[in-house]
């Protein structure tokens, strides 16, 4: 139905929050100290920054809108190795996104997101536990174009949103060689996100044909099982070795799987009807690669790439960053 493109705001907001927690997870999973050594003068402090780009697409199904979202942004974070077992920290992220959608109408706009991330990792012998809490807020703009006969009209909207997510991951270390330089980690991951895009009224040449859009709220949980394979590769002149990583997961969603909004014409905003976005597949195959290369005695340059593939939807993202050990 005309107007279904407004649902792209809510579902893209949710997907962006889930991507964000995945990026933080990739960093936190590599934190902590090497248990093979004696560590004195703790705590140890670290700071890192990274730039990230992503592309996500949800296929349109008839009059049920999908979306395409391209984002770019960055994260600054700090973490502390409090003792041999426990690491904690925080990070701030700003992402800027370009959003398009097509169904019975077409739409384009911006979806900018800002996140505060708190995280902790605990290592006990071969078991590791990881917890991430992320809160976010959003600024969004969307311009819809509706064609009729030989003409068209445009309707402009702007709004804000917020969201919260939590993620827990459990992993077990299996050494694949005698010096433990190659580690296989079977893992279990559970997460939940809840988002809200505030309602708004459109303006522009649409006049009374513009829409009053009510709040869009989504809550989705996911459980995943998979494995992470990491290994040391080469070393620099200071004896510090590079770390390579491959990740694969199968993830299952529960809860909301499509965007939905109640809308009414400005001519009679008391009468509303629901419009729906395309439904996304609940089972995903997720894969990622990472490489951390030491620089000097205290720095590390890292790169990451990730993909999420499921029925009707796919996304890819990559990041590059620098980490400094004080």
Residue ranges with predicted function:
Residues 1-59:
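Interface/linker segment at the passenger-translocator junction
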Residues 1-3, 42-326:
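Membrane translocator/pore-forming domains, dominated by Gram-negative outer-membrane beta-barrels
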């Amino acid at each position: 139905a005309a107007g279904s493109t407004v649902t792209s705001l809510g579902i893209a907001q949710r997907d962006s929050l889930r991507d964000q927690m995945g990026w933080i997870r990739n960093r936190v999973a590599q934190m902590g100290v090497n248990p093979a050594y004696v560590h004195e003068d703790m705590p140890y402090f670290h700071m890192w920054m990274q730039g990230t780009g992503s592309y996500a697409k949800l296929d349109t199904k008839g009059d049920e809108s999908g979306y395409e979202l391209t984002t770019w942004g960055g994260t600054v974070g700090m973490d502390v190795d409090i003792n041999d077992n426990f690491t904690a920290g925080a990070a701030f992220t700003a992402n800027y996104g370009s959003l398009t959608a097509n169904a019975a109408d077409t739409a384009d706009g911006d979806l900018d997101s800002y996140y505060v991330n708190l995280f902790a990792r605990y290592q006990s012998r071969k078991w590791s536990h990881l917890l991430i809490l992320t809160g976010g807020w959003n600024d969004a703009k969307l311009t819809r174009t509706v064609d009729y006969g030989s003409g068209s009209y445009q309707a402009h909207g702007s709004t804000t949103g917020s969201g919260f997510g939590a993620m827990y991951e459990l992993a077990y270390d299996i050494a694949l060689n005698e010096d433990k330089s190659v580690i296989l980690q079977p893992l279990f991951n559970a997460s939940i996100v809840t988002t809200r895009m505030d309602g708004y009224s459109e303006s522009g040449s649409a006049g009374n044909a513009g829409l009053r859009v009510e709040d869009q709220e989504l809550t989705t949980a996911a459980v995943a099982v998979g494995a992470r394979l990491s290994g040391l590769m080469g070393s620099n002149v200071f004896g510090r070795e590079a770390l390579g990583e491959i990740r694969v997961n199968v993830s299952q969603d529960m809860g909301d799987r499509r965007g939905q909004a109640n809308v009414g014409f400005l001519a009679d905003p008391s009468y509303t009807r629901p419009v729906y976005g395309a439904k996304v597949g609940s089972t995903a195959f997720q894969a990622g690669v990472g490489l951390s290369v030491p620089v000097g005695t205290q720095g590390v340059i890292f790169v990451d790439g990730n993909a999420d593939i499921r029925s009707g939807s796919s996304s890819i993202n990559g990041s590059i960053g620098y980490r400094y050990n004080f």
